[in-house]
């Protein structure tokens, strides 16, 4: 890759407001220009949502900038600095090792949206890495982030996939690519940790004031704005992680440097959606202890929020004991908020009354049924929705999911366990049209099935065939709409298709 040149052609990408921060929070860094860039995917849905000029993003000028070949005027790209706890271990200096912030887009409502290149070459934070990304890793993030957007779960956006025309060496040669990513913010818990450990409380105050002004201006005039900021980030993370779990999503690397202060899902590495249900399920090849398993994600998010609270202590109160008391009170709210979002979400998925005092034990017993029978997560809720929508007359699809032989550890067959559970559910299920509509809306027809994602990646990497990738992106953008030709995306993997591990491929 070559160094980019400066362009004086008009661009909608503005100078990023991060440059108002102290310079220790970022480093100027030029992308390594792609040798032979090719636009493989442009997310017109996202561009329309952000109210951007489609013509410009389809132009050769856009391809030059988004592939790192040029930058506009004095708008020098940069890499953000941050620290992080990675799998619980402290890393004082991390930062964007393979990403460059180009600037920001402005929406019609004057909201600023970050534009970042991922896989665009080495930065001062690369720590010996090449800063590049494989096409497979870029396709994975594009598909998974589109799936989350389609599910109405807060996420960074994938604006474009650009092939670089060069191979990237990992455990072999793979085609290289750049992901153009958008976000409300790229500030993380790790950003506050970096400010605290390297510059101290005044730097944390500067960063917190920036976050309040840019993302939560309504909190700036609060009696204690820093307490309000902590409370808002906690609230956002509690809701976000509950939403992940309600669709069987496992992030895989919930480090503090991957915990957004604006409540967005960020950094899709070894993430995946579950097929058969297992609360202890992990996919990440490096999560050998199961730290970030599906069922641990709420507790880990709270742990990350505690690390944010530690950085804000000097701002919460001048009295250290009182500051700690304030932080602990806010962190104590996490479990309530998380449980509220999770169990109310499960009530919608099961067409139950959220105010039922027996809701929590019944949901827990449902999850135990799913664990014992290893039923497919998404298919179970879809089959139950179909059964409920036919006035509980057509149960063939539901029964078929539990038609396997008895497991040695169970005293009853899966079919018997289902019937026992169904009798309890039928006594509790709400029959109103509103409840059924909420149930349908809570249970997507499609998730980003791992074996389907891998098939799309394989076709692209091995045969330069992007049709599977683009078709899957289309389906995932509308996961509640089932067309006949798309039904195969609902299929669970056969034993030989099952993806057992995922990797941080970028």
UniProtKB/Swiss-Prot annotation:
Its EC number is 2.7.7.-, 2.7.7.108. Residues 487-506 are annotated as: Disordered. Pfam families: SelO (PF02696). It catalyses: L-seryl-[protein] + ATP = 3-O-(5'-adenylyl)-L-seryl-[protein] + diphosphate; L-threonyl-[protein] + ATP = 3-O-(5'-adenylyl)-L-threonyl-[protein] + diphosphate; L-tyrosyl-[protein] + ATP = O-(5'-adenylyl)-L-tyrosyl-[protein] + diphosphate; L-histidyl-[protein] + UTP = N(tele)-(5'-uridylyl)-L-histidyl-[protein] + diphosphate. Its cofactor is Mg(2+); Mn(2+). Nucleotidyltransferase involved in the post-translational modification of proteins. It can catalyze the addition of adenosine monophosphate (AMP) or uridine monophosphate (UMP) to a protein, resulting in modifications known as AMPylation and UMPylation. This is Protein nucleotidyltransferase YdiU. It comes from Shewanella denitrificans (strain OS217 / ATCC BAA-1090 / DSM 15013).
């Amino acid at each position: 890759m070559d160094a980019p040149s400066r362009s004086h052609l008009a661009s909608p990408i503005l100078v990023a407001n991060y440059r108002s921060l102290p310079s220790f929070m970022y480093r100027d860094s030029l992308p390594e220009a792609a040798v032979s860039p090719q636009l493989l995917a442009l997310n017109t849905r996202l561009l329309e949502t952000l109210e951007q000029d489609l013509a410009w993003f389809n132009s050769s000028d856009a391809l030059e900038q988004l592939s790192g070949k040029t930058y506009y005027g004095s708008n020098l790209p940069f890499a953000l600095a941050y620290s992080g706890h990675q799998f619980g271990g402290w890393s004082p200096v991390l930062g964007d090792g393979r990403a460059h912030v180009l600037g920001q887009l402005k929406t019609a409502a004057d909201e600023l949206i970050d534009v970042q290149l991922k896989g665009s070459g080495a930065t001062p934070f690369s720590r010996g890495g090449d800063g590049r990304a494989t096409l497979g890793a870029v396709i994975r993030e594009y598909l998974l982030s589109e799936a989350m957007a389609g599910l109405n779960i807060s996420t960074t956006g994938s604006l474009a996939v650009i092939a670089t025309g060069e191979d990237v060496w990992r455990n072999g040669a793979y085609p290289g690519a750049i992901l153009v990513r958008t976000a409300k913010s790229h500030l993380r818990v790790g950003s506050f940790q970096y400010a605290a450990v390297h510059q101290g409380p005044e730097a944390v105050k500067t960063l917190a004031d920036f976050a309040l002004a840019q993302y939560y201006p309504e909190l700036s005039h609060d009696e204690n704005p820093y307490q309000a900021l902590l409370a808002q980030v906690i609230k956002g993370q509690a809701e976000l992680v509950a939403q992940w779990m309600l669709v069987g999503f496992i992030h895989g690397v919930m480090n503090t440097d991957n915990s957004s202060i604006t409540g967005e899902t960020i950094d899709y590495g070894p993430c995946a959606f579950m097929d058969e249900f297992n609360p202890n399920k992990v996919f990440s090849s490096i999560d050998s202890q199961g730290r970030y398993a599906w069922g641990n994600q709420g507790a880990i998010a709270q742990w990350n929020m505690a690390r944010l609270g530690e950085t804000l202590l000097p701002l919460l109160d001048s009295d250290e004991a009182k500051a700690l008391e304030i932080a602990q009170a806010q962190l104590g709210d996490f479990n309530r908020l998380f449980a509220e979002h999770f169990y109310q979400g499960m009530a919608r998925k099961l067409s139950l009354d959220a105010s039922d005092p027996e809701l929590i034990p019944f949901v827990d017993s449902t999850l135990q049924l799913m664990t014992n029978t290893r039923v497919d997560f998404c298919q179970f809720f879809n089959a139950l929705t179909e059964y409920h929508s036919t006035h509980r007359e057509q149960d063939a699809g539901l029964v078929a999911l539990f038609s396997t032989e008895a497991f040695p550890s169970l005293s009853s067959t899966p079919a018997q366990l289902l019937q026992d559970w169904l009798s309890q559910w039928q006594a509790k299920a709400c029959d109103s049209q509103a409840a059924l509509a909420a149930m349908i809306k809570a249970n997507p027809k499609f998730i980003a099935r791992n074996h389907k994602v891998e098939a799309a990646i394989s076709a692209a990497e091995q045969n330069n065939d992007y049709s599977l990738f683009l078709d899957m992106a289309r389906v995932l953008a509308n996961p509640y709409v089932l067309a006949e030709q798309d039904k195969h995306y609902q299929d669970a993997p056969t034993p030989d298709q099952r993806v057992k591990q995922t990797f941080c491929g970028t």
